[in-house]
Amino acid sequence: MSGDVEVYLSQVHDGSVSSGFRALYEERLLLDVTLLIEEHHFQAHKALLATQSDYFRVMFTADMRERDQDKIHMKGLTAAGFGHVLRFMYYGSLELSMLTVQEILQAAMYVQLTEAVEFCCSFLLAKICLENCAEVMRLLEDFSVGVEGVQEQLDAFLLENFVPLMARPDFLSYLSLEKLMAYLDSDQLSRYPEIELYEAVQAWLRHDRRRWRHTDAVVQNLRFCLMTPANIFEKVKTSEFYRYSRQLRLEVDQALSYFHQVNEQPLAETKSNRIRSVRPQTAVFRGMIGHSMVNSKILLLHRPKVWWELEGPQVPLRPDCLAIVNNFAFLLGGEELGPDGEFHASSKVYRYDPRQNSWLRMADMSVPRSEFAVGVIGKYIYAVAGRTRDETFYSTERYDIVEDKWEFVDPYPVNKYGHEGTVLNGKLYITGGITSSSTSKQVCVFDPGREGSSEHRTRRTPILTNCWENKSKMNYARCFHKMISHNGKLYVFGGVCVILRASFESQGCPSTEVYDPETDEWTILASMPIGRSGHGVAVLDKQIMVLGGLCYNGHYSDSILTFDPEENKWKEDEYPRMPCKLDGLQVCSLHFPEYVLEHVRRCS
């Protein structure tokens, strides 16, 4: 007979052990320990208690005096609470209500019954509301519950309901200075306008006169630059705390200075003007459907993957370039409908502020430009080359954000349009485009540190070469493509490869390339499923999105492609299609206050 061993596993063993203990418990057989709590006697099996509870396992297996006792006194918990916990250890079910959960949680924590503690926490989180929030939070704090994720869910509820909670006396009594400071410091507290947060802080201070001494500290965690001047004058300066707090007066003065210095706002990187937002939104500034201008609404790809619309500047403008400066969006040039009913190159510049969902008209460029490129370096926005209906030029000018003024700088080496520009490591890279002779592979980089004097420069200043430097050419000549910087490299997508001047026909370029500035080398990556031009690009969740454009099957697109740089793969249908098919769109990632998005949602 063979000596091979085969193992058979019972499918009912675990259940039979549990049911066996339950049967012994119900029949009061082999019970070997009595637990005495508040004059109540609970009989049980040591073996079962030790398998269910770390507390009892140590008690009955370690060198403790209770190990050999058959009667054990337990203090610090209630008989009612322990009765539920003991039943849970035998039967695996736990009956919870708001009347009993405190005693049950106390007992479960006492005997270190982790699963019962988790059930109590889940119950409390499911039942939490405005009326019992303070009670629930105090309860969990009193027992120092350390269940993973509980504090995060509590904080999420509080941040979501901060303003209505601060109208409740019980919550005002509960909320400590330390917790208030932490919540006011959070970017997740984005559902409410800042003035409502200020009014909530006033309620907390007024709840207890002894809290007034904390006013200076608390107001430093409010962001007064996110309010409006009317908020400041009507609700802040009229309060008793404005007279009481020197720090509050200082914060107000700084906010009023911020409001007054309109041009400098995009460069003011302070906590007071930073939007309360955790995740950026993908914003699409709309362009054209074919040769027809569309309205100037902004499309927002909001989570969970829903398109919303925001109003844009009320002009018949198709911007060609978009520059982002510290979460302000500048739309520049492009084409606009003239009084003659024809489209003309535009010199107009608009600034969008998502803090207040507001637009400003800024100083026009020195010359109208379409099909040009821009880049932001320091306090300047550079506009490079481009064309009008009648002329292609090489002139380069820069916009001084503080002075709201344009000036010419060293021009691009050749006349060009249809190129693309992106800033990387403080330098402006220009790729591709159309010169007088052909579609280009050329790559030039502009280094402002080597720039000549801008004094007396005009659109026709002779070419200098000290600040423009040629880099390795792309593998493919292209124009009307898109380029974006990501993880220290430049990625180029699509465009037009060849323009046949005799017939004005074009050939699409589905290729993707990446440039490494450290090696000055271009590498070909996976091609797009179908070539396109006039599309938009943005980075979202470590992936690069390609939106809309003119595909080379002859159709305009409303689709979104996503490219994973790490896997070098394209995906389709990761995101919903745009509400309409667009060409010439400008795309970016912007942070919006949640209350602005909530208003958009209600209006959509």
Curated annotation (Swiss-Prot):
- Per UniProt, residues of the BACK domain are 133-237
Q: Does the keyword Acyltransferase apply?
A: no
The UniProt entry's GO biological process terms, in alphabetical order, are: negative regulation of double-strand break repair via homologous recombination; nuclear protein quality control by the ubiquitin-proteasome system; protein ubiquitination
Metabolic or biological pathway: Protein modification; protein ubiquitination
* Record's subcellular location: Nucleus
Q: Where are the Kelch repeats?
A: 328-379, 381-426, 428-473, 489-542, 544-592
Q: Which Pfam families does its entry note? A: BACK, BTB, Kelch_1
Which Gene3D superfamilies does the entry mention?
A: 1.25.40.420, Kelch-type beta propeller, Potassium Channel Kv1.1, Chain A
Q: Where is each BTB domain found?
A: 31-98
Instruction: State a single Gene Ontology molecular function.
Output: ubiquitin-like ligase-substrate adaptor activity
Return the GO cellular component terms, semicolon-separated: Cul3-RING ubiquitin ligase complex; nucleus
Keywords (alphabetical) are: Kelch repeat, Nucleus, Repeat, Ubl conjugation pathway
Taking the first listed entry, what is the main subcellular location of this protein, grouped into a coarse class? Answer: nucleus
| InterPro entries from the UniProt entry | BACK, BTB-kelch_protein, BTB/POZ_dom, BTB_POZ_KLHL15, Kelch-typ_b-propeller, Kelch_1, KLHL15_BACK, SKP1/BTB/POZ_sf
PANTHER family hit by this protein: KELCH-LIKE PROTEIN 15, LD33804P
This chain's function reads: Substrate-specific adapter for an E3 ubiquitin-protein ligase complex.
The protein here is known as Kelch-like protein 15
Provide the species name: Danio rerio (Zebrafish)
